[in-house]
Amino acid sequence: MLADILQEAEEKMKKAVEGLRRELASLRAGRANPALLEKVLVSYYGTPTPVNQLATVSSPEARLLVIQPWDRNILPEIEKAILKSDLGLTPSSDGTVIRITIPQLTEERRSELVKVARKKAEEFRVMVRNARREANDKLKASEKNKEASEDEVKRAQEKVQKTTDNYIQIIDKILATKEAEIMEV
Protein backbone atom coordinates (compact mmCIF):
# COMPACT_ATOMS: atom_id res chain seq x y z
CA MET A 1 0.00 0.00 0.00
CA LEU A 2 2.65 2.55 1.06
CA ALA A 3 5.00 1.39 -1.70
CA ASP A 4 2.22 1.99 -4.25
CA ILE A 5 1.74 5.54 -2.99
CA LEU A 6 5.50 6.21 -3.22
CA GLN A 7 5.66 4.66 -6.70
CA GLU A 8 2.72 6.75 -7.95
CA ALA A 9 4.25 9.97 -6.58
CA GLU A 10 7.60 9.23 -8.21
CA GLU A 11 5.93 8.51 -11.57
CA LYS A 12 4.13 11.86 -11.44
CA MET A 13 7.42 13.60 -10.63
CA LYS A 14 9.18 11.83 -13.52
CA LYS A 15 6.42 12.98 -15.87
CA ALA A 16 6.87 16.56 -14.66
CA VAL A 17 10.61 16.42 -15.42
CA GLU A 18 9.98 14.96 -18.89
CA GLY A 19 7.34 17.63 -19.52
CA LEU A 20 9.83 20.35 -18.61
CA ARG A 21 12.43 18.87 -20.96
CA ARG A 22 9.89 18.92 -23.81
CA GLU A 23 8.78 22.48 -23.04
CA LEU A 24 12.33 23.83 -22.85
CA ALA A 25 13.33 22.04 -26.07
CA SER A 26 10.80 24.20 -27.91
CA LEU A 27 12.42 27.42 -26.62
CA ARG A 28 14.67 28.95 -29.25
CA ALA A 29 18.23 29.36 -28.02
CA GLY A 30 20.03 30.81 -31.02
CA ARG A 31 20.71 27.43 -32.58
CA ALA A 32 18.49 25.44 -34.90
CA ASN A 33 16.60 22.58 -33.32
CA PRO A 34 13.82 20.64 -35.11
CA ALA A 35 11.87 20.67 -31.82
CA LEU A 36 11.26 24.40 -32.41
CA LEU A 37 8.60 23.51 -34.95
CA GLU A 38 6.81 20.82 -32.92
CA LYS A 39 3.98 23.12 -31.91
CA VAL A 40 3.53 24.70 -35.36
CA LEU A 41 0.28 23.35 -36.80
CA VAL A 42 -0.39 23.34 -40.55
CA SER A 43 -3.88 23.17 -42.04
CA TYR A 44 -3.64 19.92 -44.01
CA TYR A 45 -6.93 19.15 -45.78
CA GLY A 46 -8.70 21.14 -43.07
CA THR A 47 -7.01 19.33 -40.18
CA PRO A 48 -4.40 21.08 -38.00
CA THR A 49 -1.33 18.84 -38.29
CA PRO A 50 2.16 19.28 -36.76
CA VAL A 51 4.90 20.13 -39.30
CA ASN A 52 6.94 17.07 -38.31
CA GLN A 53 4.06 14.83 -39.49
CA LEU A 54 4.04 16.44 -42.95
CA ALA A 55 7.75 16.81 -43.62
CA THR A 56 11.26 15.89 -42.63
CA VAL A 57 12.71 18.62 -40.42
CA SER A 58 16.49 18.65 -40.16
CA SER A 59 19.23 20.93 -38.92
CA PRO A 60 22.23 20.62 -41.26
CA GLU A 61 23.96 23.67 -39.73
CA ALA A 62 23.91 25.31 -36.30
CA ARG A 63 21.59 28.12 -37.40
CA LEU A 64 19.64 26.53 -40.26
CA LEU A 65 16.49 24.41 -40.34
CA VAL A 66 15.50 22.59 -43.53
CA ILE A 67 11.93 21.38 -44.00
CA GLN A 68 11.39 18.86 -46.78
CA PRO A 69 7.64 18.18 -47.21
CA TRP A 70 6.55 14.76 -48.43
CA ASP A 71 3.83 16.48 -50.48
CA ARG A 72 5.07 19.57 -52.36
CA ASN A 73 1.54 21.00 -52.56
CA ILE A 74 1.61 21.65 -48.80
CA LEU A 75 4.73 23.87 -49.05
CA PRO A 76 2.83 27.23 -49.05
CA GLU A 77 0.68 26.08 -46.10
CA ILE A 78 3.77 25.19 -44.06
CA GLU A 79 5.28 28.61 -44.84
CA LYS A 80 2.07 30.38 -43.73
CA ALA A 81 1.93 28.37 -40.50
CA ILE A 82 5.55 29.24 -39.63
CA LEU A 83 4.95 32.93 -40.34
CA LYS A 84 1.78 32.91 -38.18
CA SER A 85 3.55 31.20 -35.27
CA ASP A 86 5.03 33.38 -32.53
CA LEU A 87 8.54 32.03 -33.16
CA GLY A 88 9.67 35.10 -35.12
CA LEU A 89 11.11 32.96 -37.92
CA THR A 90 11.03 33.78 -41.64
CA PRO A 91 10.91 30.80 -44.00
CA SER A 92 12.26 30.90 -47.56
CA SER A 93 11.16 28.34 -50.13
CA ASP A 94 12.75 27.21 -53.38
CA GLY A 95 9.77 25.10 -54.46
CA THR A 96 11.03 21.81 -53.00
CA VAL A 97 12.31 22.66 -49.51
CA ILE A 98 11.84 25.43 -46.97
CA ARG A 99 14.93 26.89 -45.33
CA ILE A 100 14.76 28.83 -42.10
CA THR A 101 17.81 30.74 -40.95
CA ILE A 102 17.73 31.22 -37.20
CA PRO A 103 18.67 34.83 -36.45
CA GLN A 104 21.16 35.67 -33.71
CA LEU A 105 19.33 36.49 -30.47
CA THR A 106 19.50 40.01 -29.05
CA GLU A 107 20.46 40.48 -25.40
CA GLU A 108 16.90 41.63 -24.64
CA ARG A 109 15.36 38.56 -26.30
CA ARG A 110 17.80 36.30 -24.43
CA SER A 111 16.71 37.70 -21.06
CA GLU A 112 13.03 37.30 -22.08
CA LEU A 113 13.69 33.66 -22.97
CA VAL A 114 15.43 33.09 -19.63
CA LYS A 115 12.35 34.50 -17.85
CA VAL A 116 10.08 32.18 -19.86
CA ALA A 117 12.32 29.21 -19.02
CA ARG A 118 12.25 30.09 -15.30
CA LYS A 119 8.46 30.42 -15.37
CA LYS A 120 8.11 27.02 -17.06
CA ALA A 121 10.52 25.44 -14.55
CA GLU A 122 8.46 26.87 -11.68
CA GLU A 123 5.26 25.41 -13.18
CA PHE A 124 6.87 21.98 -13.21
CA ARG A 125 8.26 22.41 -9.67
CA VAL A 126 4.67 23.06 -8.58
CA MET A 127 3.63 19.81 -10.30
CA VAL A 128 6.30 17.94 -8.33
CA ARG A 129 5.15 19.56 -5.08
CA ASN A 130 1.53 18.69 -5.86
CA ALA A 131 2.56 15.06 -6.34
CA ARG A 132 4.25 15.22 -2.91
CA ARG A 133 1.13 16.74 -1.31
CA GLU A 134 -1.15 14.09 -2.84
CA ALA A 135 1.17 11.31 -1.64
CA ASN A 136 1.31 12.77 1.88
CA ASP A 137 -2.50 13.09 1.96
CA LYS A 138 -2.85 9.43 0.95
CA LEU A 139 -0.27 8.40 3.56
CA LYS A 140 -2.16 10.28 6.30
CA ALA A 141 -5.41 8.67 5.16
CA SER A 142 -3.84 5.20 5.38
CA GLU A 143 -2.69 5.98 8.93
CA LYS A 144 -6.15 7.27 9.84
CA ASN A 145 -7.77 4.12 8.40
CA LYS A 146 -5.33 1.98 10.45
CA GLU A 147 -3.78 0.52 7.26
CA ALA A 148 -0.30 1.61 8.39
CA SER A 149 1.39 2.54 11.65
CA GLU A 150 2.45 6.08 12.50
CA ASP A 151 6.14 5.12 12.18
CA GLU A 152 5.64 3.55 8.74
CA VAL A 153 3.83 6.66 7.53
CA LYS A 154 6.59 8.94 8.91
CA ARG A 155 9.26 6.90 7.10
CA ALA A 156 7.23 6.96 3.89
CA GLN A 157 6.74 10.73 4.18
CA GLU A 158 10.50 11.16 4.59
CA LYS A 159 11.04 9.09 1.42
CA VAL A 160 8.49 11.24 -0.43
CA GLN A 161 10.34 14.37 0.72
CA LYS A 162 13.72 12.99 -0.40
CA THR A 163 12.24 12.06 -3.78
CA THR A 164 10.70 15.52 -4.09
CA ASP A 165 14.01 17.21 -3.26
CA ASN A 166 15.75 15.00 -5.83
CA TYR A 167 13.31 15.91 -8.62
CA ILE A 168 13.36 19.61 -7.74
CA GLN A 169 17.17 19.43 -8.00
CA ILE A 170 16.90 17.76 -11.42
CA ILE A 171 14.54 20.54 -12.58
CA ASP A 172 17.01 23.17 -11.32
CA LYS A 173 19.87 21.50 -13.25
CA ILE A 174 17.79 21.34 -16.45
CA LEU A 175 16.91 25.02 -16.04
CA ALA A 176 20.54 26.02 -15.40
CA THR A 177 21.64 24.16 -18.54
CA LYS A 178 18.95 25.85 -20.64
CA GLU A 179 19.78 29.30 -19.22
CA ALA A 180 23.45 28.80 -20.09
CA GLU A 181 22.46 27.68 -23.60
CA ILE A 182 20.23 30.76 -24.06
CA MET A 183 22.82 33.25 -22.75
CA GLU A 184 25.65 31.72 -24.81
CA VAL A 185 26.55 34.17 -27.60
From Swiss-Prot:
Alphabetically ordered keywords of this record: Cytoplasm, Protein biosynthesis
One GO MF term attached to the UniProt entry: ribosomal large subunit binding
A Pfam short name: RRF
Main location: cytoplasm
Keyword Protein biosynthesis: yes
Region (Disordered): 135-159
Signal peptide residue numbers: none
GO cellular component, one term: cytoplasm
The species this protein was found in: Moorella thermoacetica (strain ATCC 39073 / JCM 9320)
Protein name: Ribosome-recycling factor
Single GO BP term: translational termination
Record PANTHER family: MITOCHONDRIAL RIBOSOME RECYCLING FACTOR PSEUDO 1, RIBOSOME RECYCLING FACTOR
Record gene name: frr
